[in-house]
């Protein structure tokens, strides 16, 4: 049985935002302490998949049992809050390279951010990474389970969501292309980005996300990538 752990549900700045004295950032409620958005999936078939690897990755992993290690990493897109922690994958790259899956744009960005991991003669101790290119609506087997990349729009940037069995995971969404709707529908669990109530050019509002969730008719829906406005 698939197990989902939300490692972080915050937006790009994290919550609390540094230097902010708003009610959410000064709150003592633990639900208002949100690391950058990421998730860990234990597939039930012996595999463990990490979705996104942001700047809080090290802190997120230290909260988990030491035996937990990702067999593969799925990247939704190239923004720093989703890839900025890739250097901290280095403990998991031995003896075998960490398998990272992303669309072509994101894969190119990872190579440019972490060039020392992709040279022929690597310096000892750098992250041992192997990149694979994903294409929307072309399923592939990753860490022993079937993964379907979903096309998603993040403002003008095409990014990826994922369907893994009964789970649909979509962050940083401003629109779901019509061709993705049938594949994103009817999930047991829908994880969906919802930035805030006020409109934003590259993220859905809470109201827009709830309307999309009704269309997709998942059994349970969880909202992520929430900023300090709520």
Where is each model-derived feature located?
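Binuclear metal-dependent hydrolase catalytic cores
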Residues: 1-170
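Cap/insert and terminal regions of metallo-dependent hydrolase folds
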Residues: 175-230
């Amino acid at each position: 049985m698939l197990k989902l752990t939300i490692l972080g549900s915050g937006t790009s700045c994290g919550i609390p935002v540094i230097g902010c004295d708003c009610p959410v950032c000064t709150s003592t409620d633990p639900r208002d302490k949100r690391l950058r958005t990421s998730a860990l999936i234990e597939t039930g078939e012996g595999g463990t998949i990490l979705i996104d690897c942001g700047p809080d990755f090290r802190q997120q992993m230290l909260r988990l049992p030491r035996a937990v290690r990702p067999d593969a990493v799925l990247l939704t897109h190239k923004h720093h809050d989703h890839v900025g922690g890739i250097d901290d994958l280095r403990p998991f790259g031995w003896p075998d390279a960490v398998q990272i899956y992303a669309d072509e744009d994101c894969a190119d960005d990872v190579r440019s951010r972490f060039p020392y991991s992709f040279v022929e003669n690597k310096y000892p101790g750098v992250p041992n990474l192997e990149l694979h290119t994903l294409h929307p609506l072309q399923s592939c087997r990753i860490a022993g389970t079937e993964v379907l990349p979903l096309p998603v729009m993040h403002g003008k940037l095409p990014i990826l969501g994922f369907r893994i069995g009964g789970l649909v995971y979509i962050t940083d969404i401003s629109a779901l292309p019509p061709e993705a709707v049938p594949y994103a529908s009817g999930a047991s669990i829908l994880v969906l980005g919802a930035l805030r109530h006020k409109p934003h050019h590259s993220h859905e509002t809470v109201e827009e996300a709830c309307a999309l969730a009704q269309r997709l008719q998942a059994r349970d829906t969880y909202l992520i990538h929430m900023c300090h406005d709520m």
